[in-house]
Swiss-Prot record:
<comment type="similarity">
    <text>Belongs to the UPF0434 family.</text>
</comment>
<dbReference type="Pfam" id="PF03966">
    <property type="entry name" value="Trm112p"/>
</dbReference>
<dbReference type="GO" id="GO:0005829">
    <property type="term" value="C:cytosol"/>
</dbReference>
<protein>
    <recommendedName>
        <fullName>UPF0434 protein Sde_1297</fullName>
    </recommendedName>
</protein>
<dbReference type="InterPro" id="IPR005651">
    <property type="entry name" value="Trm112-like"/>
</dbReference>
Length: 63
């Protein structure tokens, strides 16, 4: 589980938009950029090159 205080401070490094915590997938999702940043060993990896591109269906599911 990601600390809620930490989550409130983090934003997408590309768009500066807020992130959505997807606990089952262990990702931080940015709908604005269409990217999902992995969480590895409890640490968010906030690098654009490490992010996964969301499908259109995934983007819609987070709205």
């Amino acid at each position: 589980m990601l600390d809620q205080k930490l989550l409130s401070l983090l934003v997408c490094p590309v768009t500066k938009a807020p992130l959505i915590y997807d606990e089952p997938k262990q990702e931080l999702v940015c709908v604005a950029s269409g990217l999902a940043y992995p969480i590895r060993d409890g640490i968010p990896v906030m690098l654009e090159g490490e992010a996964r591109v969301l499908s259109q269906e995934e983007k819609e599911s987070y709205k």
